[in-house]
Amino acid sequence: LRNGVLRCVGDPGERFREDALRILRALRFAARFSLTIEEKTAAALRENRELLRNISPERIFSELKGILCARGAGEMLLAFPEVFFVILPELAPMRGFDTRRPQNHCWDVWGHTAHAVDAIAPESVLRLTMLFHDSGKPETFRYDAQAGFGRFPGHPAVSARIADAALRALRCDN
């Protein structure tokens, strides 16, 4: 830790199999303290991500809020999307989704979201809002050939529906 590196004691895969919540804790610590996750630990974290399905939603939600409110939240979202998509599969369509609006965004929707999370005050309600604010874009995308760019009719309402369902599944404490 003194060198800014987060690593598991012993075999990382074994540590994550003992308690899968350690996967999210590792991301929270790395985000909060600006740590680099050691290569074997990062690989084991990714390999064991499906074990998060065995963790109670309340515990996942608590760690998710901790990650999102840390100063390195966006970096973790970008570096470990596959982990977040296990706990929030509704957000997976955002990764790699091109809005076809280069005048507004140089990132896909997931990249834009990660940067938006970092750009707002570190309060859980605000960070969760930013996490879900464009989640409806892939579903509502329409390409306007005449205008030469994408449009997203009704995406705020669809994003709100996605957020509501996801946060209920995680038993959000309102």
Report each predicted region and the residues it spans.
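Glycine- and charge-enriched loop/helix tracts that form the active or gating conduit
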Residues: 1-131, 135-154, 158-174
